[in-house]
Amino acid sequence: MKHSVSFTYGQHQVTLETGEIARQADGAVIVNMDDTIVLVTVVANKTVAEGQDFFPLTVDYQEKNYAAGKIPGGFFKREGRPSEEETLISRLIDRPIRPLFADGFLNEVQIIATVLSYNPEVSPDIPSIIGASAALKLSGLPFNGPIAAARVGYVNDAYVLNPSPKALKNSRLDLVVAGTESAVLMVESEADQLSEAVMLEAVMFGHRQQQVVIKSINELAAQAAKPAWAWQSPARDEQLDTEVKNHFEERLVAAYQIAHKQTRQETVAQIHADAVALLGIQNNAHGWEETLVNEYVHHLAYRIVRDRILKKQPRIDGRDTKTVRPITIHTSVLPRAHGSALFTRGETQALVVATLGTGRDAQLLDTLDGEVRDNFMLHYNFLPFSVGEIGRIGSPKRREIGHGRLARRGLSAVLPLEEDFPYTIRVVSEITESNGSSSMASVCGSSLALMDAGVPVQTPVAGIAMGLIKEGDEFAILTDILGDEDHLGDMDFKVAGSATGVTALQMDIKINGITEEIMRQALSQAHEGRLHILEVMNQAIAAPRAELSDYAPRFSSMRIDTEKIKDVIGKGGATIRSITEQTGTTIEIEDDGSVKIAATDKAAAANARRLIEEIVAEPEIGRIYDAKVTKITDFGAFLQFLPGKEGLVHISQIADYRVNDVRDELTEGQEVKVKLLEIDRQGRVRLSIKEAK
């Protein structure tokens, strides 16, 4: 039976519908937001896989080309592997939903969001999050939702709910916030150096506006929700709890005071092994399963680390809650790279490299909106040796794509306009050591590498990751968190920005949301940490270098008559290809006649410019040209004096004396100077060799 609810959300009309499509899924909802239509389905396994010790949730977001009336390109003419944007939206759906599943629920769950219809004025990400929340609410799974999501813009000092992609171009903010009725769970944003106060109010504005969504999902659930699963959270085994505490608490307390990450991990791993040996069923008829023993040891470590912090005792590495780890910076570390920096903060290290290219190096993206050209790329690579592990090297994983996009958001606001700096920019962050906050190390390293490359950024940018430990009303905000503090804490709160304001904010909560006061304190503490990091960065390099690297391309610009573009390009691109091969340059010609010549050698650029000028030059009567003999006849010779332009030197114009045979004076391929005498009405050109002497 079909059920639906409708509501107004900002400027959009939204309908949630279920009961007609995908009826064999545990939950299925079609979200229609002004003709952007997304089908979201939820399916869960009824049993837990043997030995399962984590929650296997998978979210797949996919855009169908037919949604925008397009046929896919390529040989196969069908959708292939997920694009970067699809991967990012998959993560955006996953992040606010994951923490709301009941503790101990380990059944595999798959959420699929499929874009069926696309209105360019409505981005599919917000409908997808809403649809996932609604489908979960209908499924009967142990999910503590619903949640809602909203996009917030900031135009003319006013907040805008769910602005269109076109409106976002005039907005100083692009923020997505998701949360439950009472608390915020997730924030993803890019901003134009806005204050912490403006950012916080944007989050709260979005949270207030999304209440209508939560109300509507609850209305739909009242009509069509399936019965709740007969599932109960596993009861705590008090005996195992006691055994683990009695035998291993003292060792765990000592282990989590070891500052060196690898030594600490090895010590904790040994404690786990000893616990399994002592309490596991393999060696003890009255023992417990290995996964259960490890779970209880981990839970004890969780309690130890959190309790120490809430009691205001030193953190794992001995710091207080507001101290940033020691920072070291080196720039120009790679002699042939256009710009490079090695940024190390504690045991987290990023080697970041900036490369400058031409417009031809820009990335072309095939999206539902058509082909999009992107002249700024930031790629994040998490190498397995950075955490002392062996791993596969291949295409980037979801996490790497997400971290790269976050770092890019942090830098976009301070990049120069393309008309002021006509380069394609690629930044690559290689994580060579990792112990928390590697994405924010990438922001810092990228800012340094860009300045080292001579990119005229408006101002330096730094990033910092904040953490949270919360028990009841008691909480502690942690500055510059370690990997273990991220793992054992309740929040990952990343802030990037300049000394002026915030450029990117990302927040993920592992508990059932946080309050405005916690966010305010986290932003304030992050501001202090960011200014400290910027101060250290400025000691290494305070402004972009005045000169580009000797190995970076230089641009020379000129303009030609649009009627001459075809002459410069030549048949099938032969002419321009010949110039680039001859000079070793890269040449771009726009439809308006603007020409950009890129070369690492000034002489090569000048040579390419001269060749183009010769092609587009208009012949001038009385001017002397360097010419080449192309054909000899009985009455004279034809010579090319400009690319694509020939003229005749009559036998009488070859020399001051009488010439009986042209071949006695000239040969094909010979180069001589000629003077242009006349261009007749038919465009025929008369040249003279003797007048040029």
From Swiss-Prot:
Residues that coordinate or bind Mg(2+): 486, 492
Family annotation (SUPFAM superfamilies): Eukaryotic type KH-domain (KH-domain type I), Nucleic acid-binding proteins, Ribonuclease PH domain 2-like, Ribosomal protein S5 domain 2-like
Catalytic reaction annotation: RNA(n+1) + phosphate = RNA(n) + a ribonucleoside 5'-diphosphate
Gene3D superfamilies, per the entry: GHMP Kinase, N-terminal domain, K Homology domain, type 1, Nucleic acid-binding proteins
Major localization class: cytoplasm
CDD domains linked: KH-I_PNPase, RNase_PH_PNPase_1, RNase_PH_PNPase_2, S1_PNPase
Keywords, sorted A to Z: Cytoplasm, Magnesium, Metal-binding, Nucleotidyltransferase, RNA-binding, Transferase
Pfam families: KH_1, PNPase, RNase_PH, RNase_PH_C, S1
Gene Ontology biological-process entries: mRNA catabolic process; RNA processing
This enzyme's EC code(s): 2.7.7.8
Enzyme class: transferase
Domain KH as annotated: residue spans: 553-612
Domain S1 motif: 622-690
InterPro entries attached to this UniProt entry: ExoRNase_PH_dom1, ExoRNase_PH_dom2, ExoRNase_PH_dom2_sf, KH_dom, KH_dom_type_1, KH_dom_type_1_sf, NA-bd_OB-fold, PNPase
GO CC annotation: cytosol
MF term (GO), any: magnesium ion binding
Subcellular location(s) per record: Cytoplasm
Cofactor requirement: Mg(2+)
Binding partners and assembly: Component of the RNA degradosome, which is a multiprotein complex involved in RNA processing and mRNA degradation.
Function: Involved in mRNA degradation. Catalyzes the phosphorolysis of single-stranded polyribonucleotides processively in the 3'- to 5'-direction.
Family: Belongs to the polyribonucleotide nucleotidyltransferase family.
Protein name: Polyribonucleotide nucleotidyltransferase
Organism: Dichelobacter nodosus (strain VCS1703A)
